[in-house]
Amino acid sequence: MKLTCVVIVAVLLLTACQLITADDSRGTQRHRALRSDTKLSMSTRCKGKGASCSRTMYNCCSGSCNRGKCG
């Protein structure tokens, strides 16, 4: 019973800390452009038109690989 109470109190404390930290960090992002570029590069992992490709790996943005080049 004591262990259950300790776990419940710990979870409530951690939740409260998360909420307090989230409120304090609003509007304090310093390098917005850098972050958005990083997100963009992480989300687009496909290759553009004319890049080398393999038929076994579908890594072209267009979805087609003809003669080793993205189409």
From Swiss-Prot:
Disulfide bond positions: 46-61, 53-65, 60-70
Keywords: Amidation, Disulfide bond, Knottin, Neurotoxin, Secreted, Toxin
InterPro entries in alphabetical order: Conotoxin, Conotoxin_omega-typ_CS
Any one GO cellular component localisation term in the record: extracellular region
Sequence positions bearing Cysteine amide: 70
Tissue: Expressed by the venom duct.
Entry GO MF terms: ion channel inhibitor activity; toxin activity
Pfam families: Conotoxin
Keyword Disulfide bond applies: yes
Highest rank taxon of the organism: Eukaryota
Entry keyword annotation includes Secreted: yes
Compartment list: Secreted
Misc remark: Found in injectable (milked) (IV) venom.
Role, per record: Omega-conotoxins act at presynaptic membranes, they bind and block voltage-gated calcium channels (Cav).
Domains: entry comment: The presence of a 'disulfide through disulfide knot' structurally defines this protein as a knottin. The cysteine framework is VI/VII (C-C-CC-C-C).
Protein family (similarity comment): Belongs to the conotoxin M superfamily.
Name of the featured protein: Omega-conotoxin-like CnVIIF
Upper lineage: Eukaryota, Metazoa, Spiralia, Lophotrochozoa, Mollusca
